[in-house]
Amino acid sequence: MQSAVDLGGRPIHFIGVGGIGMSALAHILLKRQLPISGSDARANHITQKLESQGAQIFSRQEATNIKQLCQGSSAPPQVICSTAIHEDNPEYQAAVQAGCPIFHRSDVLAALMQEFPQSIAIAGTHGKTTTSSLVGYLLLQASLDPTIIVGGEVAAWGGNARTGESPYLVAEADESDGSLVKFFPHIGVITNIELDHPDHYTSLDQVVSIFQEFVDHCHTLIVSVDCPTIADRFLALATDQSMITYSLSSKVSADYTVQNIDYSGQGTIVEVLERGESLGQLELPLLGEHNLSNALAAVAVGRYVGLEFPAIAKALRTFSGAKRRFEIYGEAQGICLIDDYAHHPSEIQVTLASAKLQAQAAAATYSQSRVVAVFQPHRYSRAATFFQEFSQSFQDADLVVVTDIYSAGEANPGTINGKKLADAIAANHSVVTFQPTLTNVIDFLQGHLQSGDVVLFLGAGDLNRIIPDLLTHFQVSSKPSPEVVLK
């Protein structure tokens, strides 16, 4: 792949344009009136939106697409790929044969980042999308007119990207494939660092190495010292002037801390401290320590760019969240259905803790409220690498439903499956059931859910596509069945 993408007017073609990361870049470039095309094997609302904005969309990934784009053109289009696109892809092969410049999606984001003097890159193993959305929303509410690129859809700007006219860019910076090292932001935020993406990394040291290089590229760093890896390995890498820290404990030496945390109702109320001095009260329509930490990162960014705390608090009070990040899809007959992207053991634990708070609030209305976790494991490599950790991640669930593994394109090694994972979880949990297919899951939930249940759909695959049918079922059916005890 080549290294210098041209954003000055040459046509650009995205292979796999329907993906959340690729489509955000396509949206930004379309707003610049660049000739944009893309292909995706599965049409979705994202590709339809891009097409309505002027992009040429191919519904199949075929070599003829590249040939068509090259016809009558003085120069072949630049071709953008994500890590999910392999060299055996017919469009990729045709692009090579046609002499098209080929770039990774991170090359486009890196080029965009260099155009914004106040670029803000949000990195970290967990919490990137929510934190990016919070920071973007904060700057938007403060009339700073940011350009925003996130890995989720946000109602406030109607999608996963927004084009602004100011020097501010807020971008989610992905570490999953090592491309994090290409970014040189003015402000770098690191929420936490853990081993994940075992298809790319084999050790935490490899992950740390990528983040260390990213740190060297940041003018100013904002980091959570609640993360042991950051506290142990990163605090000595920057001077006090270039590193800003935050923590959920007022007893920790950090620039931004909190105290008097109150998880009440459907949100969080907390007092925010800046270098030991109270800034005031922050109210969030979000639950859970992880979301509070994400919001504190946004506070730190806001203060760094010169916002007064009352303006920050006013903005964050109305943040409505991002899709698939503890997204309350709907409620029927007292059953609350929540969609969440969590697919790593640590993410599952903190998300279930939030669901437990939600269930405690529901218990005021219903005689009993349970947390029901429906988990679709994502990738064989992740299930195998974190097998033991997954088995111990569901303690806050009253009922656990496990499906077969969503491969995400990985070959089945034949050594790991959803049933083995369900059995391992059952060794540490009293009520676990394995329902291999999504149809099985629908049938099971229709017969076992009851009023007061908080149902959390966990995973980065396609589990969430069953939620609309379940919601419709409970909206039109009679009262839910009483609990059936699993044996």
UniProtKB/Swiss-Prot annotation:
Keywords: ATP-binding, Cell cycle, Cell division, Cell shape, Cell wall biogenesis/degradation, Cytoplasm, Ligase, Nucleotide-binding, Peptidoglycan synthesis. Pathway: Cell wall biogenesis; peptidoglycan biosynthesis. InterPro entries: Mur-like_cat_sf, Mur_ligase_C, Mur_ligase_C_dom_sf, Mur_ligase_cen, Mur_ligase_N, MurCDEF_pg_biosynth, UDP-N-AcMur_Ala_ligase_MurC. Pfam families: Mur_ligase, Mur_ligase_C, Mur_ligase_M. It comes from the Bacteria. GO terms for cellular component: cytoplasm. It is found in: Cytoplasm. The keyword Ligase applies. ATP binds at residues 124-130. Its EC number is 6.3.2.8. Gene3D superfamilies: Mur ligase, C-terminal domain, Mur-like, catalytic domain, NAD(P)-binding Rossmann-like Domain. Coiled coil: none annotated. It is an enzyme of class 6 (ligase). It catalyses: UDP-N-acetyl-alpha-D-muramate + L-alanine + ATP = UDP-N-acetyl-alpha-D-muramoyl-L-alanine + ADP + phosphate + H(+). One of its GO terms (biological process) is cell division. GO terms for molecular function: ATP binding; UDP-N-acetylmuramate-L-alanine ligase activity. Cell wall formation. Belongs to the MurCDEF family. This is UDP-N-acetylmuramate--L-alanine ligase. It comes from Acaryochloris marina (strain MBIC 11017).
